[in-house]
């Protein structure tokens, strides 16, 4: 897929894979990269537009979508990883809130823009969704890829 000149949104763009995805999109000539983060993010490239967005806050996510004029590529990257043994309901709920329902909320909020541009959605999942580790089984549940 060519993203030269396209508008790209990366969630979880403040560090790690998300930050690398922003750099990669810029390197491939994206015209605009929206960097979705929970905390404000400064970036030296003028093509980067920081968007303060907590994916677990549906109202904020919807409001953020209203700030974006057009979007061609949505990269759902935001995620968390916590140690758990499935006996801690709070850890399971946190994984689901961010890694499953957060992805859902972002996709729903930006879907009208993507439909208009006939855009693309990329969900960044984990190999641990295919082979869960005993130290973090709850992480694997919402990150599992699904096929139609």
Language model segments and positions:
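Active-site helix of classical SDR
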Residues: 107, 142-145
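Short alpha-helical oligomerization interface
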Residues: 85-96
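N-terminal Rossmann NAD(P)H-binding glycine-rich loop of SDR-like oxidoreductase domains
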Residues: 14, 22-23
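Conserved NAD(P)H cofactor-binding loop of Rossmann-fold oxidoreductase domains
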Residues: 78-83
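Residue(s) in the substrate-gating loop at a strand-loop-helix junction
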Residues: 126
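Conserved Rossmann-fold cofactor-binding substructure of NAD(P)-dependent oxidoreductases
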Residues: 56-69
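Rossmann-fold cofactor-recognition segment
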Residues: 45-59
């Amino acid at each position: 897929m060519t993203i030269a000149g396209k508008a790209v949104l990366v969630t979880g763009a403040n560090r790690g894979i998300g930050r690398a995805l922003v750099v990669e999109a810029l390197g491939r000539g994206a015209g605009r990269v929206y960097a979705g983060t929970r905390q404000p993010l400064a970036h030296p490239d003028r093509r980067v537009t920081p968007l303060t967005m907590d994916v677990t806050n549906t109202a904020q996510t919807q409001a953020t979508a209203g700030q974006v004029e057009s979007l061609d590529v949505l990269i759902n990257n935001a995620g968390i990883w916590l140690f758990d043994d499935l006996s801690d309901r709070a850890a399971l709920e946190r994984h689901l809130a961010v890694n499953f329902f957060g992805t859902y909320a972002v996709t729903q909020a930006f879907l009208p823009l993507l439909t208009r541009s006939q855009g693309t959605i990329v969900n960044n999942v984990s190999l641990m969704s295919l082979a869960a580790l005993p130290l973090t089984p709850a992480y694997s549940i919402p990150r599992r890829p699904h096929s139609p």
